From Swiss-Prot:
Keywords from the UniProt entry: ATP-binding, Chaperone, Nucleotide-binding, Phosphoprotein, Stress response
Name of the protein described by the UniProt record: Chaperone protein DnaK
Modified residues (Phosphothreonine): T199
Gene3D superfamilies in the cross-refs: 1.20.1270.10, 3.30.420.40, Actin, Chain A, domain 4, Substrate Binding Domain Of DNAk, Chain A, domain 1
Organism encoding this protein: Nitrosomonas europaea (strain ATCC 19718 / CIP 103999 / KCTC 2705 / NBRC 14298)
CDD domains: ASKHA_NBD_HSP70_DnaK-like
PANTHER family noted in UniProt: HEAT SHOCK PROTEIN 70KDA (PTHR19375)
Biased composition (Low complexity): 604-617
Length: 644
């Protein structure tokens, strides 16, 4: 039976794992790395590069190299955080027809789920290469604080990649699974502090033994889906730009190529300063003006970096305190603090965590791999391979509908364990009202306009009656993926309307199907391209081999034999230029057949030479080995014992 893989679809890096027996295993990609950069590049020849290969060419192709796309997934173009990103990304963020934030590359508008799907395809292929069988099912992780639109968009990305997403699981919960599965330390409450490339989550989780079952119950979760390592990088970039402007008067923000080089340098400097006190950013020929080329050389100390990002680190404290309060716990109730996400390697972040929770965070969890491992364990649970594990997750934000006066009436409170169902009866606001609009909202504000709109639908044909008389039952149903289904029913007529919430933004079914087909077509194109490369290589190797042999043994051939081989060589070289696989294969075969005579001559020559050498060798051996008469031959003997 095919396995369900676990994928950590990260902002900066992604990781894939699978259950092998009772143990989760992180799978290395084709480049031998355990994590893959979540970077997708669109090259000139329509080739799509993913991971390390995309990252390598980013400096020469900044406008078409897409990174940190997870920050845009499920977001509207007008959102403040999106507008902020537009000013710092070398690629173009554009408004889609449905007002979502999309990206433009090579003149084509691309939806974030379609870009993320390319990363998932790479993860899927990594798993297939390792397992030696097709993979069609996956558990994919998302930040705990992702709203409904973002979860739906992640699920869409999975479908575009050809994966059936069996479960969407929260990243801190996955990390808790990875941490707690083997621990036999009794009941304990843990805090998972997850500061990744683009998002921050804090989850308070209770791990308990309940009737022989390992139970992971999320008590509360909080976070910020636009706070992560990318923001730390941006602060360093801004500092470097300011320093260079002071020195040269040139603003590098207007130069996309320079901006991409700065991004790489800022990330490297940030990482270096986790283990050293000072580093220097050296970027020769960063730009040029009338006076000639300009070079950037800026020293950054760890103290300077910490002052640049201090406010970002401080922003993580609020959600931590809120999560503790929502869980009804104090700091002293927390047994362990787990760090997840690459940004938690920064010493200042670890200091902050210690300050918030009053204890040293644990260092025995790999912050880059724990989430994928947890997703693989959840895959094992769903498959039935992992027994006695129960995962109780929560919805991160309250859900409700807009009611009279523009107020949000909550049906499901935040931190409610999922799956869950809630229902409430509402009525009409006007006399003889025959239709109602159900406007679904997600958030914590009392005023409807202050919350995220997830979508709306109408319930029509309500019999005319005075206001307040009709009884309309609204049911909210959240599935195990944290995705909402809403229905409204007129209790008098039994008429019902229901929707799986797809935000007024989001991708339509037709768009998803088109993207699925595009991804499949691209996979077919890739296969054809690979087959063509293989045929070319084979033909090229054959041409090289025959030419070499012809130079050495051509004089042994009859005139017509030699000219036949030369003609076949010429045709094979012409075929190589054509780029047509069938032609190349046919001409390679023709060259192979034409060179048979040459191979025979080579073989005969080699045999003759070998015979002559053997004869000469025997004669000389006899003359050398025969002792002169009367001469004593001394010999040393060594006893060789048989190995027992």
């Amino acid at each position: 039976m095919a396995k369900i893989i676990g994928i950590d679809l990260g902002t900066t890096n992604s990781c894939v794992a699978v259950m092998e027996g009772n143990k989760p295993k992180v799978i290395e990609n084709a480049e031998g790395a355990r994590t893959t950069p979540s970077i997708v590049a669109y090259a000139e020849d329509n080739e799509i590069l993913v991971g390390a290969s995309a990252k390598r060419q980013a400096v020469t192709n900044p406008e078409n190299t897409l990174f940190a796309i997870k920050r845009l997934i499920g977001r509207r173009f007008d959102e403040e955080v999106v507008q902020k990103d537009i000013s710092v990304t070398p690629y173009k963020i554009v408004r889609a027809d449905n007002n979502d934030a999309w990206i433009e590359a090579r003149g084509r508008k691309i939806a974030p789920p379609e870009v993320s799907a390319q990363v998932l395809i790479k993860m899927k292929k990594t798993a297939e290469d390792y397992l030696g069988e097709p993979v069609t099912e996956a558990v994919i992780t998302v930040p705990a604080y992702f709203n409904d639109s973002q979860r739906q968009a992640t699920k869409d990305a999975g479908r575009i990649a050809g994966l059936e997403v069996k479960r969407i699981i929260n990243e801190p919960t996955a990390a808790a699974l990875a941490f707690g599965l083997d621990k036999k330390e009794g009941d304990r409450k843990i805090a998972v502090y997850d500061l990744g490339g683009g998002t921050f989550d804090i989850s308070i989780i209770e791990i308990a033994e309940v009737e022989g079952e390992h139970q992971f119950e999320v008590l509360a979760t909080n976070g910020d889906t636009f706070l992560g390592g990318e923001d730390f990088d941006s602060r360093v970039i801004e500092y470097l730009v300011d320093e260079f402007r002071k020195e040269s008067g040139i603003d590098l923000k207007k130069d996309m190529l320079a901006l991409q080089r700065l991004k790489d340098a800022a990330e490297k400097a940030k990482i270096e300063l986790s283990s050293s006190q000072q580093t220097e950013v050296n970027l020769p020929y960063i730009t040029a003006d009338a006076s000639g080329p300009k070079h950037l050389a800026v020293k950054i100390t760890r103290a300077k970096l910490e002052s640049l990002v201090e406010e970002l680190i401080e922003r993580t404290a609020g959600p931590c305190r809120t999560a503790l309060k929502d869980a009804g716990l104090s700091v002293s109730d927390i047994n362990d603090v787990i760090l997840v996400g690459g940004q938690t390697r920064m010493p200042k972040v670890q200091e902050k965590v210690k300050e918030i929770f009053g204890k040293e965070p644990r260092k025995d969890v790999n912050p880059d791999e724990a989430v994928a491992i947890g997703a693989a364990i959840q895959g094992g649970v769903l498959k039935g391979d992992v027994k006695d594990v129960l995962l109780l997750d929560v919805t991160p934000l309250s859900l409700g509908i807009e009611t009279l006066g523009g107020v949000m009436t909550k049906l499901i409170q935040k931190n409610t364990t999922i799956p869950t169902k809630a229902q409430q009866v509402f009525s009409t606001a006007d006399d003889n009202q025959t239709a109602v609009t159900i406007h679904v909202l997600q958030g914590e504000r009392e005023v409807a306009s202050g919350n995220k709109s997830l979508g709306q639908f109408n319930l029509t044909d309500i019999p005319s009656a005075p206001r307040g008389m009709p009884q309309i039952e609204v049911i909210f149903d959240i599935d195990a993926n944290g995705i909402l289904h809403v229905s409204a029913k007129d209790k008098a007529t039994g008429k019902e309307n229901k929707i799986k919430i797809q935000a007024s933004s989001g991708l339509s079914e037709d768009e998803i199907q088109k993207m699925v087909k595009d991804a499949e077509a691209h996979a077919e194109e890739d296969k054809k391209a690979l087959d063509l490369v293989n045929s070319r290589n084979q033909c090229d190797a054959m041409i090289h081999s025959v030419r070499k042999s012809l130079a050495e043994y051509g004089d042994k051939l009859e005139g017509d034999e030699k000219s036949r081989i030369e003609a076949a060589l010429k045709e094979a070289e012409e075929a190589l230029k054509s780029g047509d696989k069938q032609t190349i294969d046919a001409k390679t075969q023709a060259l192979t057949e034409a060179s048979h005579k040459l191979a025979e001559k080579m073989y005969a020559q080699e045999q003759a030479q070998a015979g002559q050498q053997a004869g000469a060798g025997t004669a000389s051996d006899q003359s050398q080995d025969k002792p002169v008469e009367g001469e004593v031959v001394d010999a040393e003997f060594e006893e060789v014992k048989d190995k027992k």
